[in-house]
Amino acid sequence: MQAPPSFYEGDTLEVAKKLLGQKLVHIVDGIKRSGIIVEVEAYKGPDDKAAHSYGGRRTDRTEVMFGAPGHAYVYLIYGMYHCFNVITAPVGTPQGVLIRALEPVDGIEEIKLARYNKTEITKAQYKNLTNGPGKLCRALGITLKERGVSLQSDTLHIELVPKEEHISSQYKITAGPRINIDYAEEAVHYPWRFYYEGHPFVSKK
């Protein structure tokens, strides 16, 4: 079952925690690639100095953040790595959740090819498939073409995992500071990174 529009509404920190354990799905050339979300970061612009929308900054890149919740915000870092975010909060409130890491589930062969251009990989390479925001976008084939796409679409969405299959019973949710935001002054210390403690696909312990 796809997460309905209402799933993305409400407090961004709560939406971030609700995303843990759900499945991010991208259909590429008719083939399903997916992974269970195991690590996220919340960004609460315009008061959050780590957010692209801090101070109400509104640009062509950030415009989607000001729109309806439940849309994809994709951007590039270092000119080469894509990052995938879920827009949250009401229209006009530019907030979102960065998906930092996944446990790969569907389309494993396609994911391996996307990451390493081969299907025979080592155990270390397997653990490295989707344990970071740029890695998971490469693995799932998410690019700037997906910016602004509704997460109600057939090709890009979040699937709600049934309670009996949900991994939340196996892992404790831990909160801590977000990663690589040294520029963000006091916001550096906000405990808005949420992840499953001990999960092998978390990007940073």
Curated annotation (Swiss-Prot):
GO molecular function ontology, one term from the record: alkylbase DNA N-glycosylase activity
InterPro entries for the chain: Formyl_transferase-like_C_sf (IPR011034), MPG (IPR003180), MPG_sf (IPR036995)
Entry keywords, A to Z: DNA damage, DNA repair, Hydrolase
Domain of life: Bacteria
Transmembrane regions listed in the UniProt entry: none
Enzyme class, spelled out: hydrolase
A single BP term in Gene Ontology: base-excision repair
Keyword Zinc-finger: no
PANTHER family reported for this sequence: DNA-3-METHYLADENINE GLYCOSYLASE
Protein name (record): Putative 3-methyladenine DNA glycosylase
Organism for this UniProt entry: Bacillus cereus (strain ATCC 14579 / DSM 31 / CCUG 7414 / JCM 2152 / NBRC 15305 / NCIMB 9373 / NCTC 2599 / NRRL B-3711)
